Regions:
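Residue-level signal for the "D+5" position in two-component response regulator receiver
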Residues: 42, 67-70
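Alpha4 helix (beta4-alpha4-beta5 surface) of REC/receiver domains from two-component response regulators
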Residues: 74, 95-129
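Two-component/phosphorelay signaling modules centered on CheY-like receiver
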Residues: 24-41
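Active-site residues of response regulator receiver
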Residues: 64, 92
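Acidic, metal-coordinating helix/loop segments flanking the phosphotransfer/catalytic sites
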Residues: 42-60
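Short amphipathic alpha-helix used as the core "switch/output" element in two-component signaling
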Residues: 51, 73-85, 106
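Acidic catalytic/metal-coordinating carboxylates
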Residues: 45, 71-74
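Non-catalytic signal-transmission and effector/linker regions of two-component phosphorelay proteins
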Residues: 1-18, 125-148
């Protein structure tokens, strides 16, 4: 079981991003891309994700579709039930032409904000833009839930 690790205390105005991926290298890469702009926490499996959700409400979760102990779609549902304002971006190492379209559609239907492929088109600007858009939506969701 991978441990949950929290980043430094969130600074005012920084969004809280939770990276959930069983590949340490992918978590390291995403942290490197995002840590200058966001408060980053990490989880390496489904159990660590559940533990993380007990301690904090992330604004955005980057969630791998395939974890050793959990299905990404099931985790998506758990996240949205626990923290409805949180936006979830699904991650997959599967090529986009290998049947990923069907589970991508299921993820969007289940409340996912978006999808990032961990393939060759994976780029820093794409990750930053997707997370920024998801954070804006999460903040709007929070305001709506608070009645404002």
């Amino acid at each position: 079981m991978a441990a949950f690790t929290a980043g430094s205390s969130p600074q005012a105005g920084k969004g809280r991003i939770l990276i959930v991926d069983d590949e340490e290298g992918m978590r390291d890469l995403l942290r490197a891309i995002l840590e200058s702009d966001y408060h980053i926490s990490e989880a390496g499996d489904g159990a660590a994700l559940h533990k993380a959700l007990e301690h904090e409400q992330p604004n955005v979760v980057l969630l791998d579709m395939k974890l050793p102990d959990a299905n990404g779609l099931g985790l998506l549902s758990a996240i949205k039930q626990r923290w409805p304002a949180t936006e979830v971006i699904m991650l997959s190492g599967a090529p986009t032409d290998s049947g990923a379209a069907s589970w991508t559609a299921e993820a969007v239907k289940g409340g996912a904000f978006g999808f990032l492929s961990k393939s060759a088109e994976f780029s820093f600007p794409t990750v930053l833009a997707c997370v920024s858009s998801a954070l804006e939506q999460a903040q709007a969701n929070s305001a709506a839930l608070l009645g404002g």
